UniProtKB/Swiss-Prot annotation:
InterPro entries: MeTrfase_TrmA_AS, SAM-dependent_MTases_sf, TrmA_MeTrfase, U5_MeTrfase_fam. Dual-specificity methyltransferase that catalyzes the formation of 5-methyluridine at position 54 (m5U54) in all tRNAs, and that of position 341 (m5U341) in tmRNA (transfer-mRNA). The active site is at C319 (nucleophile), E353 (proton acceptor). It comes from Dichelobacter nodosus (strain VCS1703A). GO terms for cellular component: cytosol. Gene3D superfamilies: 2.40.50.1070, Vaccinia Virus protein VP39. Pfam families: tRNA_U5-meth_tr. It catalyses: uridine(54) in tRNA + S-adenosyl-L-methionine = 5-methyluridine(54) in tRNA + S-adenosyl-L-homocysteine + H(+); uridine(341) in tmRNA + S-adenosyl-L-methionine = 5-methyluridine(341) in tmRNA + S-adenosyl-L-homocysteine + H(+). This is tRNA/tmRNA (uracil-C(5))-methyltransferase.
């Protein structure tokens, strides 16, 4: 059997990750593939004008110019509700001067539940006339709609979608906000959640989660621990997390608005934080058996790495295997790698999402 183009890409990613993890005596890497199309739950496009015609546009690389533009009517990598809506929405925008005048970008955000939120971004102020036309458009296409321009945002119904992810037979519900981070590939995200829960096992102790975002991992992992302390610095992410905790009726998660660096200072008693007292959090009450981290592409700072070395078990999700490998230089001084996985969140791109588990030697 010959390999498909997707299988070749995935094999190349596996080889790259294997080479990066080989110095740390990594076990066999489990591979979690993506559907080959209709996997992206969010997509953003420029609007391009050509002879009074409107097109969705992407760049072949670099700045968007007439020489490197890719004109689109639909986008097969996008989730089916986005892909089907794109050409119909474009026709409707073309036909209405109020809606297409100085329209600059269109952003789509979809959920497996079938909800679709569309953001229209303009280089002009939005008027009552625009609002009336936008309401008619939203009703016609059964979508949530937001209009944006400089210092202006008009939300016609709400600025988030409802998502439901299934993990080992249990449904977890999320508010996913426009302009806030959420996992772009819901199919692979569910595989990541199942893997993380399997690695967590059943624990009598507590979980520390750094960089928790909107609670994507927090909620499924909470059922595997006595208590969870989740930290995040973004106020908008914390708002979404608290809503999602309420939505799922989870009662063993405490939330601290701290960066990873600030938590390290608090844990090592280098600094007192009023935010912890305000939330009623006493760090001395926790018995952390596991720490879960999903850091930004830059990886984890040195002080936080030294903090992680104190915990028996580390589950590390990475969107940049190169910074993961750099962080493992420190973490494997005290821990050994006992599990590794590749999650293909981004087919047809060189990006690699991966996870590792480390146990104290």
């Amino acid at each position: 059997m010959t390999m498909s183009n997707y299988q070749r890409q995935l094999f190349a990613k596996h080889q790259q990750l294997h080479a990066l993890l080989r110095p740390f005596s990594a076990p066999k890497i489990r591979i979690y593939p993506s559907p080959e199309k209709h996997y992206r739950m969010r997509a953003e496009f420029r609007i391009w004008r050509d002879d009074e015609q409107l097109f969705y546009a992407m760049s072949r690389g670099g700045a968007l110019t007439a020489q490197n533009i890719v004109r689109l009517h639909n986008f097969p990598p996008a989730y089916i509700t986005i892909d089907r809506c794109m050409p119909l929405l474009l026709d409707a925008l073309r036909a209405d001067p109020v809606l297409h005048h100085k329209l600059y970008e269109v952003h789509f955000l979809a959920s497996l539940r079938g909800e679709l939120l569309v953001s229209l971004i303009y280089h002009r102020a939005l008027t009552d006339e625009w609002t009336a036309a936008a309401k008619a458009l939203a009703k016609r296409f059964h979508i949530l709609l937001i209009g944006r321009s400089r210092k202006q945002k008009i939300t016609l119904e709400r600025d988030f979608i409802l998502e439901t992810l299934n993990v080992d037979g249990r449904a977890f519900h999320y508010h996913q906000y426009e302009q806030s981070f959420s996992q772009p590939n819901a199919y692979v995200c569910q595989k990541m959640l199942r893997w993380a829960c399997a690695q967590a096992g059943e624990n009598a102790g507590d979980l520390l989660e750094l960089y928790c975002g909107n609670g994507n991992f927090t909620l499924p992992l909470a059922s595997h621990f006595r208590r969870v302390l989740a930290t995040e610095i973004s106020k908008s992410s914390i708002t979404a997390l608290q809503e999602n905790i309420f939505l799922n009726q989870t009662n063993n998660i405490a939330v601290a608005r701290l960066s990873a660096e600030e938590f390290t200072q608090a844990w090592q008693k280098e600094r007192d934080f009023y935010r912890l007292k305000q939330a009623g959090i006493e760090l001395a009450d926790y018995q952390f058996e596991t720490v879960f981290v999903d850091p930004p592409r830059a990886g984890i700072d040195d002080n936080t790495l030294f903090l992680l070395q104190k915990f028996p078990k580390i589950i590390y999700i990475s969107c940049n295997p190169h910074t993961l490998a750099a962080n493992l230089q420190t973490l494997t001084q005290t821990h050994e790698l006992c599990a590794a996985a590749l999650f293909d969140q981004f087919p047809d791109t060189p990006h690699i999402e991966c996870g590792v588990v480390l146990r104290k030697k």
